[in-house]
Structure formats: structure tokens, C-alpha cells
Curated annotation (Swiss-Prot):
HAMAP family from the UniProt entry: ArnA
Keyword Lipid metabolism: yes
A Pfam family assignment: Formyl_trans_N
This protein's GO CC annotations: membrane
Annotated site (Raises pKa of active site His): 140
Name of the featured protein: Bifunctional polymyxin resistance protein ArnA
Active-site feature positions: 104 (proton donor), 434 (proton acceptor), 619 (proton donor)
Pathway of action: Nucleotide-sugar biosynthesis; UDP-4-deoxy-4-formamido-beta-L-arabinose biosynthesis; UDP-4-deoxy-4-formamido-beta-L-arabinose from UDP-alpha-D-glucuronate: step 1/3; Nucleotide-sugar biosynthesis; UDP-4-deoxy-4-formamido-beta-L-arabinose biosynthesis; UDP-4-deoxy-4-formamido-beta-L-arabinose from UDP-alpha-D-glucuronate: step 3/3; Bacterial outer membrane biogenesis; lipopolysaccharide biosynthesis
GO function terms (MF aspect): carboxy-lyase activity; UDP-4-amino-4-deoxy-L-arabinose formyltransferase activity; UDP-glucuronate dehydrogenase activity
Record site: Transition state stabilizer: 102
Family annotation (InterPro entries): Arna-like_SDR_e, Bifun_polymyxin_resist_ArnA, Epimerase_deHydtase, Formyl_trans_C, Formyl_transf_N, Formyl_transf_N_sf, Formyl_transferase-like_C_sf, Lipid_A_modif_metabolic_enz
Amino acid sequence: MKTVVFAYHDMGCLGIEALLAAGYEISAIFTHTDNPGEKAFYGSVARLAAERGIPVYAPDNVNHPLWVERIAQLSPEVIFSFYYRHLICDEILQLAPRGAFNLHGSLLPKYRGRAPLNWVLVNGETETGVTLHRMVKRADAGAIVAQLRVAIAPDDIAITLHHKLCHAARQLLEQTLPAIKHGNILEIAQRENEATCFGRRTPDDSFLEWHKSASVLHNMVRAVADPWPGAFSYVGNQKFTVWSSRVHPHASKAQPGSVISVAPLLIACGDGALEIVTGQAGDGITMQGSQLAQTLGLVQGSRLNSQPACAARRRTRVLILGVNGFIGNHLTERLLREDHYEVYGLDIGSDAISRFMNHPHFHFVEGDISIHSEWIEYHVKKCDVVLPLVAIATPIEYTRNPLRVFELDFEENLRIIRYCVKYRKRIIFPSTSEVYGMCSDKYFDEDHSNLIVGPVNKPRWIYSVSKQLLDRVIWAYGEKEGLQFTLFRPFNWMGPRLDNLNAARIGSSRAITQLILNLVEGSPIKLIDGGKQKRCFTDIRDGIEALYRIIENAGNRCDGEIINIGNPENEASIEELGEMLLASFEKHPLRHYFPPFAGFRVVESSSYYGKGYQDVEHRKPSIRNARRCLDWEPKIDMQETIDETLDFFLRTVDLTDKPS
């Protein structure tokens, strides 16, 4: 049976050997070039392929149409993937009439995603395994063909567990590959409600946070022990690595991170104490804990920290343009909740951020981005992270003031992007779910969905294409000039301080604010073209948590990424949104202050938005990038968001002249 194989690492080598032993004909192997910054302790797929006389390739992007065509010419009957590090596009998967199969290092549906070997140890699991599953468009989500369980011993570290998994994988493939060859397999669908997903790990993720329990820190040490980069901490600015450890149930009142003793080297944790058995100072040699203490100059009572002392003193400076807006003010609140951010903001108003004005780490200037260009350039140069959140983002303005939308949303933001390029500053840019336009995909995917808009004589698309072109400009600056960037695409975020009722009175607001105004004034709720259009509504708290994690950028996982931030489970039509809002309104304790409900009224979009409007029937995000890069899932139910948003707006209404 002819096959094409995608493989890397030890699992890739043993997978290839198993295929050959089972009588498969391998037409080509696709692998990766080794990363010079990665310790190569594993077998070389490229070398094995060369020794076996099999053509081998390592393209940067195997999903490029040219490679898809070359693979199609090989006419594979079946495709296998063994620890290949990139997602394989659906066009390639569909080339094999007998299907495509992937070997994954966990007991799916648990631990989908990257580095399951390390994550199970980090999380203190006692069992894992290997799974052979059918490949589908969504990573690690296809039906299970075979699994083998592997026990995790208390003394297992990453390398010993790796060897166990390799042994299990050989057994599993020996048993299963002949059955696949003869079409004699039983597939079991994964239980989505049991699925968990984890993102890529980098060396920077393995710092020891001493406020955590000793058992948690010991698991971190096990998960990244040699030949992985190791768990680490600091004494002042001196970095050291912990290669092995033991948990002590030591009852101590010492502050977490304090040295309890140096022989053995015992460190106080949030719960218990951790003995550092072996470690390494800087780029030195491995030594026992007591010698490490001497090398680092530690004595009883010394304090360790999770980051260099100089870094701990320096707050990250974040520039938010449009800080008084819906996202800006909520993000400011989230950043100031931590003690390592300095927020600089500019906006034309300050009502939503008045609660921060006396905060020592919040600095605000009232101004217009089209006028205060010198102030903006200076602060781009001064700050570490830039978020240009200023935009006209209400649909009625797209047809009413298309040129103003272009001037502000495109031209002014392009200038800020160029400042970031000039001063080599990280930019986190708010793209929009609008860029997907009339895409027909069930889930809008950042990396694969087409961006489809209407004709030029429909000015409603000027916002979408302005944002899309900026996305492409930023991407090009990243590719050609090294701009550090992340694009995020919000999907219908809702919550307190979204617009205001005065904006709704002139039609320049989002949908829920307009509906609340109708209820407050006793006017009919207008359902544009029947209100059947579906959206996925996302609580502002979920959205801001994801955005905060983008700013944190653990392990630089967000660099160069486009990330949808939305809740695909909170899908509802505008009509359903209105009905849910009405039910919440009728139960509200302030309900008696407002007029009777005036009913729903269906209106044509042209009469509401004006000439040149087109609507989108559905807009549902894929959030695989958010899961992978941020370890993020939305949690808040739509009804809770509606209740809190309604309550906020009703309490802003002056009730002094309302009948009680």
C-alpha cells in the first residue's frame, strides 16, 4: 500500500520502521530541519530516510499549493503523521482514499495539542498513553483507531516517560498497521465533552513560581529535566537550573522562595518545601544541591525569585490609544490589577476611565490621534507594547460616513504601525471578525478561511477592507522588517460600558445597546431584515482575559499570530438576543420605572442603515489558535452577559422623573 509520511523525532523514526515492517511502500517522507537552538537527543528522520533510500523533504510550508500538487502526483492510498509539528491542510488529507492517520502522545481526547508528554508531568498525572487516530481538519479531533495506556511512575521524568511512550507506540503500530492495511479497523468517535487542549511549551515557560506548592514545582522539574531545557529560578540576576528535586512536607513560616537550609538545599514553597537535589548555575556544570548553594552564595534566609531582580523592578509600559473605549477601559482595569504594568492612554474622552485617574501607574492625556501625532510618536518610542484601539466600528457609520471610517480606521492606524516598525516596538492590533465578510465556512479560521466582501458599490465593506489591508500590511512588516506583532479578532464582545445610550439614540451603537434603548424608551425593537442573522456573543471578561494573555505573551507564543477571540457556544440570532434581553428586562428590579414593551418590528436594512448595506448571515469563530497560543477557553454564558449589560445600562438612566 502506497503511503506518504509526515514525521519527526524518535516517534517519527519508529513509525517509519513500523510501516516498512508492515509492508507499506513509502513514496516520500516530509520532516523538519533541526532547530539549532534545540538539543537534538532524538533520532533523525532525514538520516533514516536517506539510509532507506526514500525521498525526503523539509519544506517551510508543506501546505503550499505547489507541495499539495507534488503530493497529489505521488497518489498515496493512505497518509501517516508521526510527531510532525505542523498542521496538515485538508487538501492534503483528502488525497488519500484510505484516509490519514496520526500518532499522538496522549490518551485522546485528553491533552490534545502540543507537548502532551511534558504537560502530563506538569499536571501531575499518573497515567498517559499513545493514540492512533484518523486525521481531520481540526487538530487531534478525529476518530480513535487504537490506544495503549502508559503508567506514570512517581520517579518518571520527561526522558523516561518518553522512552515508555516510544515502547508503547511500537506495540500499538505493530498491532494496528496490518489492520489498517487490510481495511479491518474499528473507529470510535472522541467525546468532545472530555477534550482538553494544551499549547506549545517553550523554555521560558519553565520558571519556578515559589508561591506554588512544592509538589507542583517538583512536577515542573520532572517535566523539563535534561535533555529538555530545565526548570529555572534566579538569585538576584543570576539564573540557575534545577535538574532534579524532592518534595519535603516541611512546615515552615518562611516566605515562599526563602532558603530554609543549604545542606540539603531546601526552599520554602507556598505549601511544603522543595529540595534541590542537583542543579546548574548559569551555563556551568551540573552539581549537587549543597555545592550549588555554595556556588550561588546562598545562606539560610536568602531569597530566590522567578525572574531577574532587574526585570522585577521594571514595569512593562503599555500604550493604549482609545483607552476610554469599550475594550480600552476594561483592558486598563485588567492590567492595573497586576503590579507589573504601566499604562499610558490617549482618548478624546475620559468618562469610562475616571475610576483610574488617581492610580499611580495610569497616565492619561485627553486628545485626538489625528492631532496629537508628536505625543503618540514619543510614547510609541517610550513604551514596550502598543495597542491602537481607535476605530469607528458601528455598522451605520460604514454607509453614513465611509470616508471618515477610512481616514480614521486605516490612515491614522497605518501611521502608528509605521512608528512601531521605526522604533521596533511590539504591536497588538485589533483586527475584526468583519474581515471574514461573507465567508461560507462553518467556522471562521484565521489561517485558512477566505476573506470575502461585496462589490464596491456597497460601502458597508469599507471598514472590513480597511482592517483587512492593515492586517496584510502588518503581516508584511513582520515578514520583511521583523515587526513583532499579534492580530486579534474580537467576535461580538458585550458587557458593561459597551457604547452608551446617547450613541444609540443617533443609531451609532452596537446591537445590544440599541435594543436596550428601545426597552428604556418604550419604542419597538427593530429587527433588521427579520433579525435572523446569527452572531457568537462573547463576554467582555472572557475577551479581556484572552487579550491580557496576548500581552503577557508567555514563551512568545503569540508572535506573528492571528487569534480569533470569541465564544462559538454563545451563538444566537439578533431576534433571539432581543427575546433574551426582553426576558431579563421584565425580571429586573427597576422594570417598573420604564414604559411597557412596544413589541418587535421587522424593518428592511436599507431603511435602517441606508443605501449600500449588506449583512452577514452567520459569523462563528474557530478558536484553535486561542487554545494553542493562550491556553484560553471562553467560560461565561450569554445569559449572564446579557443580564449584567442590561443592569449596567439601566442604572445609568436618570430615574428622577420616572414614575415609581
